[in-house]
């Protein structure tokens, strides 16, 4: 790719792939916009949108490396989640309105949780929630909800 020294002097000439740990208060588009501003280039793209409240790896391609996006989007993904039992919201995340009062879930064992999680391991088909970054006709679902 680009000579690192010339990229420092002229950020617009930088080509490459950045691995960014997206914070929960940024959208994937916010990250792309920030990279565009710092590197002073419009040719910046990512390999997959993370939901607005999700944190994690966002792969960013810059300039000539944007040609690689098509080869990086089909890779398997791994998710790490934290559960709060006895609590549900209308959005399916912590920002929503509670659907019911918080209930005591202390009777649920770790074995029961592990058994329930088996349904979320491996290759699964999931219907995206309305409060997600999934786009329908170019509009994120969370904006339509």
Features from the language model and the residues they span:
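Catalytic/RNA-binding core of pseudouridine synthases
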Residues: 1-145
């Amino acid at each position: 790719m680009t000579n690192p020294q010339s990229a420092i002097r002229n950020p617009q000439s930088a080509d490459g792939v950045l691995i960014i740990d997206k914070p929960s208060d940024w959208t994937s588009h916010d990250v792309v916009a920030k990279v565009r501003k710092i590197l002073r280039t419009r040719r910046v793209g990512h390999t997959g949108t993370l939901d607005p409240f999700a944190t994690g790896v966002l792969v960013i391609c810059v300039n000539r490396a944007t040609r690689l996006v098509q080869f990086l989007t089909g890779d398997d993904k791994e998710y790490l989640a934290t559960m709060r039992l006895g609590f549900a919201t209308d959005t399916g995340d912590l920002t929503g309105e509670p659907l019911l009062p918080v209930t005591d879930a202390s009777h649920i064992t770790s074995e029961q949780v592990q058994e329930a999680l088996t349904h979320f391991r491996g290759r699964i088909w999931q219907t995206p929630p309305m409060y997600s970054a999934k786009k329908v006709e170019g509009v994120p679902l969370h904006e339509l909800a």
